[in-house]
Amino acid sequence: MRKRRTLTAPSHFNSMSAALNPMKMAAMQSQPTVDDSWAASISRIMSLTAGDRHKFSSQPFANRLDAILEAVVPSRKDPTHEKVLTIVNALIENGAIRRDEGAGVYDALLHRVSKYNSINTQSNLERLAGDVREAVAQQVRIAAGNLGSLTALNSFLARLPANVERGQDNYTGFLSALKLLVSEVPNTEVYQSGPHYFLQSSRNGTQTVNLTNAFENLKPLWGVKAPTMERLSISALLTPNTRLLLLLVSPFTDSVSISRDSYLGYLLTLYREALGRNHLDERTLEEVTEVSKAMGNENINNLQATLNFLLTNRQKKIPKDYSLTPEEERIVRFIQQAVSLRMMQENLSPTEALDVTAANMEPSFYANNRDFINKLMDYFHRAAAIAPDYFLGAVMNPRWLPPEGFFTGVFDFPERDNYIWDGPDSSLDLTRQDAMRFLEEKFIDDDQRTESRSVSRVPTPASSRRSSVAMASDSLIRPMNNDKNSLREIEVLADKLARWKTYKRESEEARESLPVVVRPKKYSSAISSDESDDGMSKPDKFLKFEGSGNPFAHLRPKLGRCL
């Protein structure tokens, strides 16, 4: 009895101590994870078939294999859940949580530990980092063909100056676009041959550019801003090699890195828009060429007559009537008002005002009308760079509507014209006086001018005629208040015009009034003398001065010309 008492007392004592100690309670709750001795491990392994061998052997092989592996090599001991269980037991003993809430707290603590401080998380991160390194290495191996090109390009760029005199932004933006071209396009290579570097592209046929000569040609053109009329003279400075480089790099540029106000930015934008148009209507030329080749004519020069006939007799299409929707017109008025206020109140340049207006737009408003706003802002940017006066008039005019070129993409901005009324000293009165003076001088010849200077102020037919012309002109220029008087003045002017005689008629009447003079014929002697050996002794059939009247009468001005 004593022995039994001694056996039961410790067990009761141990259970009481475990209930008071959370760590012992957690150890008892997680008993399968404690360390086993070698004898316990052997007995556990052999106990798989101790009961009934046929029962164990009849199980699937996968289940038997898992049981054997687990019995021989148990899973790694992880005390995390034991520690969490200890914490939960301590919270229950202290009254922080109820006993029925322990399972939820235990699950939440395990989930948080596995999320933020778990070996599995670290291993997953290591696997993810390994996958990333493998993907990067694979990408580098795929692009191994461009590594040599990038190395050659970097060595070429190392020889270029870091800064230029002007246009530093355009210079760095163009270099970035060139790097993007070499790294992204698979059929593009850069190599060195002697002191020169070459760029070779095989996208649409093999095209080779001498980078050294191209950058030497572009050296004085970085940041050059050329107006519309001076672009032709600057265009002559670019070589075909440089133009090809600009054409290849243009798809990788934008108006942010390279300013569109500069000449190179204008060319790159032009090339980029030209390459962006995929639809080219060349069916007529292809059909005519195919028919000609089928007929045995390989020379395309013989097709000029056919092509000229097709171009001459093509049907003309009625121009489309472009107009804005009410919503688009409201957008135009909003942008006009915003840009004009920025320019007048904040004293910003046109380009800065457009940029600030675009930056302050509401995102939802811009997202709903993105295409039209981009098109309108691009049109205003072009107008501000090419025709500032036209841009100012378009922004300040509350009734302005975009022209046809805005819809078709053919931008043709009008140039400034110097009108007569632009001068500060000109007026309509001065213009009228100049016209009257010119009208009087038109009907006066040189003889009448000299006579008018020498003779006193006696009225002459010419002066009376001038006065009549002036009166008639004044009557026409003055505003006509009475219709009857205007008709009478027109009749008087017509009667005077009918009585006027032309210079030809006056010369004919004067010639008819003169008596006819018969001049004796001149006889030339057969014997030539030295005194008369001047080349004019014989009549010349090419120099005939016979006849009466003034031989230069046909050079005098005619008075019969109309106003």
Curated annotation (Swiss-Prot):
| Any Pfam family matching the protein | Hex_IIIa
User: Keyword set for this entry?
Assistant: Capsid decoration protein, Capsid protein, Host nucleus, Late protein, Phosphoprotein, Viral genome packaging, Viral release from host cell, Virion
Using the record's annotations, give every residue carrying the modification Phosphothreonine. Answer: T284
Q: What is this protein called?
A: Pre-hexon-linking protein IIIa
- At which residues is there a site annotated Cleavage? S548, G549
Which stretches does UniProt call biased (Low complexity)?
462-472
* Record note on quaternary structure: Interacts with hexon proteins; this interaction tethers the peripentonal hexons to hexons situated in the facet. Interacts with the penton protein (via N-terminus). Interacts with packaging protein 3; this interaction is required to promote correct genome packaging.
Compartments (UniProt record) = Virion; Host nucleus
**Where is the stretch described as Binding to hexon-linking protein?**
148-261
Where does it primarily localize?
Answer: virion
Give a short account of its post-translational modification.
Cleaved near the C-terminus by the viral protease during virion maturation to form the mature protein.
Q: Which family does it belong to?
A: Belongs to the adenoviridae hexon-linking protein IIIa family.
Q: Positions modified as Phosphoserine?
A: S235, S452, S456, S475, S486
Which InterPro entries does this chain map to? Hex_IIIa (IPR003479), Hex_IIIa_N (IPR043053)
GO CC terms: host cell nucleus; viral capsid, decoration
What does the record note about the induction of this protein? Expressed in the late phase of the viral replicative cycle.
The lineage's top-level taxon is Viruses
Q: Which residues form the propeptide?
A: 549-563
Q: Which organism does this sequence originate in?
A: Canine adenovirus serotype 1 (strain CLL)
Q: Where is this region: Disordered?
A: 449-472, 522-543
Q: What else is known?
A: All late proteins expressed from the major late promoter are produced by alternative splicing and alternative polyadenylation of the same gene giving rise to non-overlapping ORFs. A leader sequence is present in the N-terminus of all these mRNAs and is recognized by the viral shutoff protein to provide expression although conventional translation via ribosome scanning from the cap has been shut off in the host cell.
Q: Which HAMAP family does the entry link to?
A: ADV_CAP3 (MF_04047)
